[in-house]
Design a protein with these regions (language model features):
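Non-catalytic accessory regions used for complex assembly or targeting
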Residues: 1-4
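Core of compact, soluble alpha-helical bundle domains
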Residues: 9-63, 68, 74, 117
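Short amphipathic alpha-helical segments and their helix-coil junctions
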Residues: 15-24, 78-97
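Residue-level detector of well-ordered alpha-helical segments, enriched
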Residues: 34, 38, 61, 81, ...
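Amphipathic alpha-helical binding modules
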Residues: 88-120
């Protein structure tokens, strides 16, 4: 994914750099292959301002993440653990942080629920 000319970074590479910085600030390891797979899963929405962000203050959005991503894509059964994982990520990224990137959010959910095998 890396471009040899840093002045010509693609939008995805810029997102990747921002994501790495976000994880480093949280003291977490970055797995590029997993990140790339999640970006591919999310498709063009990662480049759309509203769709690229998660609003932890919106219960409908959090329910959609649980149903569509955790239960749908990751194949997990509905349980209190799913809601706990979502809240853990909301708090970990900062409840007052209005720019919780969906890629980071999903990446962290995959990691804490040990579902990396779905993507890599």
């Amino acid at each position: 994914m890396k471009n040899e000319n840093p002045s010509e970074l693609s939008a995805t590479e810029k997102l990747s750099d921002a994501f790495k910085e976000e994880l480093n600030n949280l003291g977490l390891h970055y797995h590029e292959e997993l990140y790339d797979a999640i970006v591919q899963y999310l498709g063009p929405s990662v480049h759309q301002k509203d769709a690229s962000l998660v609003a932890c203050s919106d219960p409908t959005e959090l329910e959609n993440i649980k149903k569509n991503f955790l239960m749908g894509k990751l194949g997990l059964e509905d349980s209190p653990r799913l809601d706990e994982a979502i809240q853990e990520i909301c708090h970990g990224l900062g409840m007052s942080n209005r720019n919780k990137h969906r890629t980071s959010f999903y990446y962290l959910l995959v990691a804490i629920l040990n579902k990396e095998s779905v993507f890599i």
